[in-house]
Amino acid sequence: SVTTIREMAFYNCAYLQSITLPAGTESVGNNAFDTCTSLETIDFGGAKTIGQSVFYGCTSLKSVTISGECTEISVNGDGDTPFMDASALEEIIVTEGSGNYCTENGVLYNKDKTTLYAYPSAKKDKEFTLPSTVKEIAQSAFYHAVNLEKVDISGVETIGTYAFEECSALKSVKTTNTITSLGVDAFFNCTSLKSLRFGDKLTTIGSYAYGFYYNEDADPEND
């Protein structure tokens, strides 16, 4: 039976819409489903390790199911999880098991829910409140969450690089005086966000943590 899905194994399978890997699958290689543009659902079967950029170019992917025995979801060279590449993703499901991950309402966390790893980009909810256990928002966790307008991150201590980048609908972020670190580009290009409030525990602010690209030539007031 199949135990390994190698790198680029399903590369550019343009008509593949759904796939369920065997329960005996142990590992899935880097870019395994690269450019599967029609793929909407994937079940990783029993895979314990999932490689880098496995969803690169999977522009139709809506649902991902991961084994509860999974111990590693690899990040790429820039530190991003594979979910950053899935712009149509609505839910992530982790089955029961003794691995390192869990999900709640389609959102991916580590097992004890102290780190939020991935919020699906196309999740339909407009408001979201993090579980009180979460202390860290991982790199790119909310990247391009296009429907998210209001988020409550009370109790969080660390906000990773690119954490909320390109959340263009985001208008409100509720925080508490617990945040100590704000990563590079953390709220970059959140064009609907008018204000952010942090307490005096914040000691590190990464470059371009909030802001947006400004094109002077495109501003009618400067014509």
Feature roles, as predicted:
Residues 1-4, 13-27, 36-49, 59-72, ...:
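Structural signature of tandem-repeat unit edges
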Residues 10, 77-79, 129-131, 142:
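Surface-exposed beta-strand edges and their flanking turn/coil or helix-capping segments
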Residues 56-57, 78-88:
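Beta-strand repeat architectures
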Residues 76-77, 208:
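A short acidic (Asp/Glu
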